[in-house]
Amino acid sequence: VNKDTFRQQYDRFISSTYKDAPDNRVMCTSGSTGTPLRMIQNRDKIRHNTAGGIFLGAAAGYYIGMKEAFIRVWVNNVKKSKFQLIQENMIMMDSSRMDEQALAEMFHTIEKKKVKCLVGYSSALGELSDYIRKSGKDCSNCSVRAIIPISETMPEPVRRTLEKQFGCPVRAWYSNEENGIMGLQNEKDEGYRIDTETYYYEILKMDSDEPAEQGELGRIVITDLFNYAFPILRYDNGDTAVAVRKEKHGRFKLYLSELYGRRSDLLYE
């Protein structure tokens, strides 16, 4: 299934058992590839996502309570209230405007507000890095301790430049609104360790539903093991990756040695 399948058969996917549960949560995609998709999550899924976010956040250098700046397009269906911003100790930074003045204001806020964690679109963080380099800004007065790119693949040279500028690790999350945080980039290379306890992953060939060979670029297909309100089974989310299986302590774990964005944005043979 894919997003179009969910949109066309939306009511049939919703679990009758969980449909009207008062503690459900509705997550919305940004709609960058079409109409936003509303995804219902049950209480246990929400709790599992929260626990996963805490664990993978700490692994990336972000801890609960840190001042966080989140750089993305803040459309109405994801915009946070003033209470939520206080509760989460967060600053919203809008990436829909990234001219020199906007970047200067962004850097000033990061420095003045003593932001400790930067989360944002990879492209927006790249533009901020480029602005710092061109303007000769001094990052030594900044308090940033962790940078977490999301949504797009960050080129390795940009990642290493950001690490040098702010003197902190830059490790991307692999995540989406439908499922949550699904993996964390390795510290020393571009690969990802993915959460195989919460999700079952398949890497299928680009032009068929046969499993891709190890080391072959393929489509990511996800089964969410915890969302009972809106079962996500064999979901082709449009992303592509090269996967390898590694043995550790008698168990084989799946790693993504290369991760790319939406298939519609790629050219391949």
Regions inferred by a protein language model and the residue ranges of each:
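Nucleotide 5′-phosphate-binding alpha/beta core
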Residues: 1-28, 34-50, 54-65, 74, ...
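Short, flexible, solvent-exposed loop/turn segments with mixed acidic/basic and small polar residues
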Residues: 27-28, 83, 256-259
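Conserved AMP-binding loop of ANL adenylate-forming enzymes
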Residues: 54-97
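Short, acidic Gly/Pro/Ser/Thr-rich loop/turn segments
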Residues: 36, 76-78, 227-230
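Active-site glycine/GP-rich loop and adjacent strand/helix microenvironment
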Residues: 87-269
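Short hydrophobic/aromatic segments of transmembrane alpha-helices and their interfaces
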Residues: 19-20, 29, 164, 225
